[in-house]
């Protein structure tokens, strides 16, 4: 039910300002004078401001009232105009390349607070960002105050450092179950020699408003390869087939394409029935992993096979 919150500051020369809509508190926002009554799910940002001192750190809290979830809960906070403004809002205008500062608060199904992190957020995906419920890619950066999210997000992976995570909307399965992609990847776990992105469903609140189920996913990046395969992130080639305005292209994410081009040219120029040729290819690539990839693509009727394909190797 409703309750009140009391705020205090240690100096008589400072005052507390607060907001309840996700915006940054400042001298032009609400001045705290009496306890704040909380009657429904609310996000509170508060900071102290004095005449001869630097403004205090912004304190963030999310209060859930009569909200029940059996899933982990994400509270995603951002300046409202960075989301909804008709000129600059990334949600309003479907701006994919614009990155906005956000605060993330994570709560376990038992409502325990897991972590709070300041980060950047962009709309993610190739086409799925056009859905009414959009995916977010989260980027930790030094300028936001931290390089990693230090928390174990996934039960089936003993990893507790993330520089990128994705709050996915279900992708091509958005209108249906939201779980086809993570369910398919769960079949790979422990069974095939393929990298896969871990998955955990969550209930996401955007500036205090319930925003539906979003799947927490890993993201393929240099830190992913370090944590999952214990390889030097500065010494890999990482390539991705993705769609661009000029069509589907193979792009270099990390390293170079030299080794890949050498291998492809060798394959096109030689007879794979020759055992010596095949043995050479096995030295250059993990053939079993590639077979597993093809098996899953066909068996699970992958509808995004024209893109969303990534290769990597440790140099």
Give the predicted meaning of each segment.
Residues 1-121, 142, 170:
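Short, compositionally stereotyped local motifs that mark structural "simplifiers"
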Residues 190-205:
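Short, well-structured beta-strand/strand-turn elements
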Residues 91-96, 128-129, 301:
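Short consensus segments that form the blades of beta-propeller domains
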Residues 2, 33, 41-43, 60, ...:
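Extracellular structured ligand-interaction cores
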Residues 136-158:
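Reverse-transcriptase-like RNA-dependent polymerase core
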Residues 102-111, 179-194:
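Zn2+-dependent metallopeptidase catalytic core
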Residues 151-158, 162-177, 209, 215-302:
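ATP-dependent phospho-/nucleotidyl transfer catalytic cores
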Residues 207, 296-315:
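Zinc-dependent metallopeptidase catalytic helix centered on the HExxH motif
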């Amino acid at each position: 039910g409703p309750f009140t919150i009391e705020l205090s500051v240690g100096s008589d020369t400072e005052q507390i300002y607060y907001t309840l809509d996700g915006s940054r508190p400042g001298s032009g926002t609400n001045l705290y004078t009496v306890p704040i009554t909380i009657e429904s799910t609310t996000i509170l940002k508060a900071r102290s401001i004095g005449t001869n001192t630097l403004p205090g750190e912004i304190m963030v809290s999310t209060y859930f009232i009569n909200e029940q979830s059996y899933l982990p809960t994400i509270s995603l906070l951002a300046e409202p105009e960075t989301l909804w403004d008709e000129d600059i809002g990334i949600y309003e205008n479907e701006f994919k390349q614009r990155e906005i500062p956000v605060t993330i608060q994570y709560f376990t199904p038992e409502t325990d607070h897991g972590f709070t992190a300041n980060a950047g957020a962009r709309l993610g995906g190739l086409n799925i960002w056009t859905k009414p419920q959009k995916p977010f890619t989260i980027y930790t950066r030094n300028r936001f105050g931290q390089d990693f999210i230090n928390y174990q997000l996934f039960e089936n992976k003993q990893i507790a450092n993330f520089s990128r995570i994705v709050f996915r909307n279900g992708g091509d399965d958005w209108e249906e179950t939201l779980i086809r992609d993570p369910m398919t990847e769960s079949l790979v776990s422990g069974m095939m020699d393929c990298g896969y992105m871990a998955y955990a469903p969550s209930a996401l609140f955007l500036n205090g408003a319930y925003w539906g189920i979003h799947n927490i996913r890993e993201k393929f990046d240099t830190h992913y390869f370090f944590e999952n395969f214990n390889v030097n992130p500065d010494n890999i080639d990482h390539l991705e087939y993705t769609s661009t305005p000029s069509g589907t292209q193979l792009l270099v994410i990390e390293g170079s394409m030299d080794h890949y081009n050498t291998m492809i040219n060798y394959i096109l120029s030689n007879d794979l029935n020759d055992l010596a040729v095949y043995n050479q290819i096995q030295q250059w690539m993990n053939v079993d992993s590639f077979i597993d990839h093809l098996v899953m693509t066909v068996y699970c009727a992958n509808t995004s096979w024209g893109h969303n394909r990534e290769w990597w190797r440790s140099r």
